[in-house]
Regions:
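Membrane-interface helix-boundary motifs at transmembrane edges
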Residues: 7-10, 115-126, 184-187
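Membrane-interfacial loop-to-transmembrane alpha-helix junctions, especially the N-terminal start
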Residues: 12-17, 122-132
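N-terminal signal-anchor transmembrane alpha helix
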Residues: 15-52
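C-terminal ends of transmembrane alpha-helices
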Residues: 29-35, 136-153, 184
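Long, glycine/tryptophan/cysteine-rich extracytoplasmic
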Residues: 49-72
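Individual transmembrane alpha-helix segments
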Residues: 67-107
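Hydrophobic cores of alpha-helical transmembrane segments in multi-pass inner/ER membrane proteins
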Residues: 103-109, 165-182
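Non-cytosolic membrane-interface motifs at loop->transmembrane helix junctions
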Residues: 152-164
Length: 187
């Protein structure tokens, strides 16, 4: 029988995988609420590092609001939007993006530990590395989706949205499969 992981780390791995599954579920729900509140286009830039912090001053809020005013969603649908209304939609998108970043870090940091401690066999190491690449791809697809609504449309491309959601479901399914597989092999 093939050994997938070192037995002494099985509890740690189970907690990690369950937390990842929960996190993906939360991100999908927040993403759905972002979509339902038409908030997805409120952040018109993709600042992977500097976008970690939301606007903190009135001047920064004005800058972000002015960027939003340049896209069709604002000037065709939301011309009368106030700053306080903009902040609401901004925070929905911001929370969705920050949760994605946290998920990426929460996946990567234990993965580095897993590689250092050689917890998984080589096959599973490769599988989890591929999952990490898919998480990075998910962030890029999210931006690719948002970008589709910044120029000519007032919403994002439904096709890109479907790709974004389906990749989240693929990630969830793969992690759940690993969880089940690891636990069935360890019994």
């Amino acid at each position: 029988m093939e050994i997938i992981l070192r037995k002494e780390y099985s509890k740690f791995i189970n907690y990690w995988l369950i937390t990842l599954l929960s996190f993906i579920g939360i991100i999908v729900v927040v993403g759905g609420l972002t979509r339902l509140t038409d908030s997805g286009l409120s952040i018109t830039t993709w600042d992977v590092v500097s976008g970690i912090l939301p606007p903190l001053t009135d001047k920064q809020w004005e800058q972000y609001f002015n960027l939003y005013k340049e896209i069709p969603q604002f000037y065709l649908l939301n011309q009368n939007m106030s700053m306080s209304e903009f902040k609401v939609i901004y925070y929905w998108e911001y929370i969705h993006r920050i949760l994605g970043r946290i998920l990426g870090l929460f996946f990567l940091m234990p993965l580095v530990f897993i590689y250092i401690k050689k917890i998984f066999n080589k096959k599973y190491n490769l599988n989890f590395f591929i999952l990490f690449l898919l998480i990075l791809l998910q962030g890029f697809i999210g931006w690719y989706m948002v970008k589709s609504g910044l120029v000519e449309n007032t919403t994002v491309s439904h096709y890109r949205l479907a790709i974004h959601l389906n990749l989240a479901l693929i990630l969830f399914s793969a992690i759940f499969w690993f969880f089940l597989n690891i636990n069935s092999k360890s019994n």
